[in-house]
Amino acid sequence: MELHNDEKRLLKAFKDSAKNIIDSEGLLEYIEKEKIMRAAFWLTGRDFLNIIEKKSKFLELTELGKNAIESGFPERKVSNYLKTNKLDSFPIKDLSKVLEKDEAGAALGNLKKKELVTIEKGNIFFKSLEYKDLEEELLKKVSLYPNLEEYSKEEILTIETLKKRGFLKLNEVTEREFEITVKGLEYIKNPIEIKEEVTQITRDLIVSGKWKEVSIRPYDAKIPTEEIYPAKAHPMSKIIEEVTEVLTSMGFSEVKSQIVQTEFWNFDTLFEPQDHPARDMQDTFFVKYPDTGIVPHELLKKVKSIHECGKIENEKISKGWCYKFDEEVSKRTVLRTHTTVSSIKYLSSLSNEEKENFHKVFCIDRVFRNETIDYKHLPEFYQCEGIIMAEDVSFNNLVGILKEFLSKLGFEKVRIRPAYFPFTEPSLEAEVYMEGKGWLELLGAGIFRPEVLEPFGIKKPVLAWGIGLSRLAMLRLGLTDIRELHKNDIEWLKKTVVIEK
């Protein structure tokens, strides 16, 4: 194995010193400082070396801190003024005569906080002019002993106060040591020969004939290099982009709707009763302003009739929910709790002629639930849903489409089990199999109930399904906590693989 000259120089330091661990200073005799880390990184990639990093935190006095040690804290200046002038009190309004403008307010606040003074009729009275100040003493100590590790928990609390006052700042220093491995020790048992190398054959080398004498370093495409993290899209954005591409390739068109919806569109049109638990404040975000919205009057009458008695004009669809429907509730505004509202609005917009055609649409967007934040719940997340409206589609078609969709997302093993949703019948849940995790629920689906479709004058079956994209992202990225998707952890974002199937 041929090593770079810088790698050889670094290993020679271990050979000559017979040490297993050497710090950066110990290598300077053999290799230039700016080349140490590059050579060490290469040797680490060859398993010849380990890099040991130790991070230390050191405190540093700011200009304010240095002035405080030389001239005293602002509160000490006040007490010294009283001692010098043999006064027992001092008017608050005259603080600016003793202190700088930016010191006066802080001095008074700290005198009261430290319980060194009492305030009477606008005058400051010191309990004792000969007082001890822990902050002053600690600041002097820090000027002599800056290593943070040398301080107790109580002292660190005081240090935090000194930092807030602008007297101190914290610096982090990384110290590195280099440890040779067993493989590296085997290598240095042999003589280490360092030849003059050239990386580029120049005209002068050719003309002079020196190219015959020098060692030309071979180009090694496999040599370890520093990792580079180029700019890339957020993993959640890539998931959304991928799902959009999959659905578009399957013949779906994308539709959108507003974030703020009336309860009519969000709940009533989906045949969800007005006393359903999902519609209370524990699950839904109600909008304060505007708190009501416009509802299409004729459609409202039809939906109301469906809810109350299951009828559209004289046509009996079902029993309905058998309760008194409140039109004012329908007008209240909410943050949408699902993207199905986009499909419902799309269906309601179809003309009689358009209802005769074949329709495949989907929506990917943010939805909102009044959830308690934990490892699997957020109040805001992305959802994807879609519908297919056609004359002869059936439950079997729905299962086939879902399996194709999940297969294109990389899930080969899919199983279907029965489920219940208020606005579809029959309904199903699809589970996918993941190695090491078993079967996991991923999406819900079904066929829209007649009570949902009849108010729009739609007689054809409509297949519907929905999937939480945050759940999909967790499975694909191997996350156990949904909050990790939105932490903006730069290290995680840099190292996360842009989605692979």
Swiss-Prot record:
Domain of life per record: Archaea
Record-listed Mg(2+) binding positions: 425
Cofactor(s) for this UniProt protein: Mg(2+)
Keyword field contains Nucleotide-binding: yes
Keyword Phosphoprotein: no
Main location: cytoplasm
Catalytic activity entry: tRNA(Phe) + L-phenylalanine + ATP = L-phenylalanyl-tRNA(Phe) + AMP + diphosphate + H(+)
One Pfam family named in its UniProt record: tRNA-synt_2d
EC number(s) from the headed UniProt entry: 6.1.1.20
Compartments reported by the entry: Cytoplasm
GO molecular function ontology, one term from the record: tRNA binding
GO process terms (BP): phenylalanyl-tRNA aminoacylation
One GO location term (cellular component): cytoplasm
Manner of cofactor binding, per the entry note: Binds 2 magnesium ions per tetramer.
Keywords linked to the UniProt accession: Aminoacyl-tRNA synthetase, ATP-binding, Cytoplasm, Ligase, Magnesium, Metal-binding, Nucleotide-binding, Protein biosynthesis
Binding site residues for L-phenylalanine: 340, 423, 448
The family this protein is said to belong to: Belongs to the class-II aminoacyl-tRNA synthetase family. Phe-tRNA synthetase alpha subunit type 2 subfamily.
HAMAP family: Phe_tRNA_synth_alpha2
Subunit structure: Tetramer of two alpha and two beta subunits.
Protein's UniProt name: Phenylalanine--tRNA ligase alpha subunit
Gene from which this protein is expressed: pheS
